[in-house]
Amino acid sequence: MRHWLFKSEPDCYSFTDLENAPGQTTSWDGVRNYQARNFMRDDMKKGDLGFFYHSGKNPEIAGIVEIVREGHPDITAQDPEAGHFDPKATPGDPRWYMVDVRLVRSFVPPVPRAFLRRQP
């Protein structure tokens, strides 16, 4: 089993959004970084765990998620109405991938990055 970091701006998609999602599960879509895409497409496996990390003004780990569906084409790349549209993505050559994650555990309170930096 491998472990991953799932980073999100809390004003775009927060841990609370995941808590309120049906089945506390969501597709981790919209990633437009080639190395992260390759990890999702090739390396992330069902059952792997990850930290849900809020970036931004108050960076913190809000909880733990589990990958429940391995890499599959990111449909937002092919939707002109989506904020992550890529005109070069096609059904035959999707270019971008996503995984589905489910909430495992929330950290109350969340673990601030400043605390993590003080750990050996």
Label every model-predicted segment:
Residues 1-46:
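Compositionally biased, charged N-terminal/linker segments
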Residues 2, 61, 97:
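Residues that flank catalytic or metal-binding motifs in active/ligand-binding sites
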Residues 14-16, 59-63, 74-76:
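Short acidic/glycine-rich loop or secondary-structure boundary segments that cap or lie
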Residues 53-59:
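Short, charged beta-turn/beta-strand-edge "cap" motif at the junction between a beta-strand
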Residues 10, 56, 105-107:
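A broadly conserved detector of short glycine/acidic/proline-rich loop/turn motifs that flank catalytic sites
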Residues 64-120:
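Aromatic- and Lys/Arg-enriched surface recognition patch
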